[in-house]
Amino acid sequence: MLFRSETGKSVISLHGIEIDRVNHTTKFNGVELELTPTEFRMLWTMMSQPGRPFSRNELMETSRGEDANSLERTIDVHVRSLRKKLEPESELIETVRGVGYRFIRK
C-alpha cells in the first residue's frame, strides 16, 4: 500500500491499481484504465479508506460532479462497470449487504 503526501495524498496504489488524483489517471497492473469521472471519484473514495464500507448515499455524494440528481441504484451500475474494468480482480470491490460497498484490503 502506497500513499504519497499523507495530508493531501495525490496517488494511492493498492493491489496493482494506481490512482492519481492530480493527473486524473488510473492504471491497473501498469495498463491505463479508461474510467468515467464518476467511476474515478468512486474508486478514489473507496481506495482512500480500504476496508471501510461506504453507503450508496456516501458514494453518490462523492460523485456529485456528474450525477447530481442520480438515484441510489445508479451507484450499483457504476460499481458493476468498475468491477468489469478491474477483471480478473473484480472482487476488490466488495458488496456489504445492507450498507453499500468497500474496497478490500486483502
Map each language-model feature to its residues.
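C-terminal edge and immediately downstream basic/flexible tail or linker adjoining helix-turn-helix-like DNA-binding
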Residues: F103-K106
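Core catalytic loop region at the nicotinamide-binding pocket of NAD(P)H-dependent oxidoreductases
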Residues: K9, E91-E94
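A short, compositionally biased
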Residues: E6-G8, I19-T25
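Conserved protein-kinase catalytic-loop position immediately C-terminal to the HRD catalytic Asp
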Residues: H15, V22, V99
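Positively charged, aromatic-enriched patches within helix-turn-helix-type DNA-binding elements
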Residues: T25-V77, S81-S90, R97-V99
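Basic, amphipathic DNA-recognition helix from helix-turn-helix-like DNA-binding domains
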Residues: M1-S13
